[in-house]
């Protein structure tokens, strides 16, 4: 067994790979700026995690894996190269991990994490014992990765830094396509080109499963067909525009007592028309689409859709994806990772469905200057389903601080109850002072605003 050192081990991507290697019997060490919850979990699982970066941390490593956020001049990268230790980027290392398994890669602008988790959960329940890597912890199993004994490997395929082009899956899912990551893809056409290259990676016996009622995927479907790839389209019946010999669709959506949708699924993937009923507890029409993608995978693998439907009914979601953090003083507090206008609108719509008639207060922490400025107009219009909107200052993430404030987005909002409060601490105190019984607090952030949920929950209990 090898000793593998991870630079940036606390992130969702590298922490998942590290867990996979730990479960496979390898020795794992890693370093990061801070000790994240993912890193704490890895310590409990047997990894050695260092805070900060130093050349001595790579001592004895057989391989080094670096996050895409780690620069070339990182002291551990430099020390590894000087010692002739192989240094891999995440994408290249993942490709090697998947080489001997049937790879299922989930890509797209929105819904990757939940769809990946649904597929992994269903295959686990169907006794296929899959390996998987997810961008967040799956609630049903409490982990974001697992080294399974089966021959299937399910992975969330991140398009940032073109990471997904290092994978070699046999089944690809593309949930939707919208312009995102402008620091990596200046235009939608740049991003589409990367996704076309992703589709080109499919082998002769591979299949593209794609949401066919998403406008952004239309050129990708055209490209896949011209390249001779097998294509399966999935869609809601109300939006059905599939012109494909292979399809799966949801019909008769109805709200259920679990808080999600119940619906019937029709498909022609098994050689003739088939149908199955599904009852979801995760809310929103977007999760119906995610479930369709999971069922398409099940059919392609020749497994029981009836058993898969039962597994989907027990699927409880992933961390920070419409995650109920708690209730206090009659206030319901929910965390969500939404950081793109379309994701925000879908999450607010799901909240309206789950909590009809209740006042919804949305807290949004903009994620990166580039995304906030490129999608400025879209963000300003994304909050129509919220009764009150509170916007913090931008979370810069990997970007340098800029002469821009998200107060400008608030000024452009047509919303009557939108306000800018710069710091998370000030936002938490405002909410503790002003939230009322029956309010729903929805915290939308891909940064560190989940601390608002924890602080407000604790503060309300003391109020």
Predicted regions and their residues:
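Nucleotide phosphate-binding/pyrophosphate-handling subdomain across enzymes
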Residues: 2-5, 13, 17-24, 171, ...
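Short internal beta-strands
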Residues: 26-33, 208-212, 361-365, 385-395
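Beta-strand->loop->alpha-helix junctions that form or flank phosphate-binding loops
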Residues: 29-32, 50-53, 88-92, 133-136, ...
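Phosphate-binding loop of NTP-binding sites
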Residues: 20-26, 43-44, 57, 68-212, ...
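C-terminal helical cap/extension that packs against the catalytic core
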Residues: 380-437
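N-terminal leader/targeting and accessory segments in enzymes
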Residues: 1-93, 215, 252-254, 283, ...
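Structural beta-sheet core signal
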Residues: 6, 30, 132, 172, ...
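Conserved hydrophobic helix-helix packing surfaces used for dimerization/oligomerization
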Residues: 4-6, 64, 104, 130, ...
């Amino acid at each position: 067994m090898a000793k593998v050192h991870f630079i940036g081990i606390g992130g969702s991507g590298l922490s998942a790979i590290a867990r996979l290697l730990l479960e496979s019997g390898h020795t794992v060490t890693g370093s990061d700026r801070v000790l994240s919850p993912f890193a704490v979990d890895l310590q409990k699982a047997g990894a050695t995690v260092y805070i900060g970066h130093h050349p001595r941390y790579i001592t004895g490593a057989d391989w080094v894996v670096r996050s895409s956020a780690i620069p070339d001049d990182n002291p551990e990268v430099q020390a590894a190269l000087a010692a002739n230790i192989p240094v891999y980027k995440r994408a290249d290392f993942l490709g090697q991990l998947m080489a001997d398994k049937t790879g299922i890669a989930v890509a797209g602008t929105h819904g990757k994490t939940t769809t990946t988790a649904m597929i992994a959960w269903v295959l686990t329940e169907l006794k296929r014992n899959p390996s998987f890597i997810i961008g967040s912890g799956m609630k049903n199993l409490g982990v974001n990765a697992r080294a399974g004994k089966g021959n299937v490997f399910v992975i969330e395929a991140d398009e940032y830094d073109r990471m997904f082009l290092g994978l070699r899956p046999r089944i690809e899912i593309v949930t939707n396509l919208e312009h995102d990551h402008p620091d990596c893809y200046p235009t939608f056409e740049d991003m589409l080109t990367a996704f076309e290259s992703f589709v080109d990676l499919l082998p002769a016996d591979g299949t593209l499963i794609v949401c066919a009622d998403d406008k952004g995927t239309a050129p990708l479907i055209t490209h896949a067909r011209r390249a001779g790839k097998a294509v399966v389209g999935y869609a809601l019946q109300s939006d059905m525009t599939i012109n494909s010999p292979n399809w799966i669709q949801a019909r008769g959506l109805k709200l259920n007592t679990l808080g999600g949708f119940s619906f019937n699924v029709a498909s022609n993937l098994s050689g003739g028309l088939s149908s199955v009923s599904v009852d979801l507890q995760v809310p929103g029409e977007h999760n119906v689409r995610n479930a369709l993608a999971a069922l398409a995978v099940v059919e392609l693998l020749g497994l029981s859709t009836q058993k898969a439907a039962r597994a989907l009914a027990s699927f409880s979601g992933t961390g920070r994806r419409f995650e109920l953090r708690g209730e206090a003083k009659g206030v319901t507090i929910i965390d969500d990772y939404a950081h793109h206008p379309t994701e925000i609108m879908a999450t607010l719509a799901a909240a309206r469905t789950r909590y009809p008639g209740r006042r919804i207060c949305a807290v949004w922490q903009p994620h990166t200057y580039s995304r906030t400025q490129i999608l400025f107009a879209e963000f300003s219009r994304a909050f129509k389903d919220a009764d009150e909107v509170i916007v913090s200052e931008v979370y810069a993430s990997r970007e340098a601080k800029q002469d821009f404030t998200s107060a400008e987005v608030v000024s452009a909002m047509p919303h009557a109850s939108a306000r800018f409060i710069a710091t998370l601490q000030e936002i938490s105190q405002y909410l503790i002072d002003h939230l009322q019984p029956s309010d729903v607090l929805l915290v939308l952030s891909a940064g560190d605003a989940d601390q608002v949920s924890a602080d407000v929950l604790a503060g309300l209990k003391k109020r």
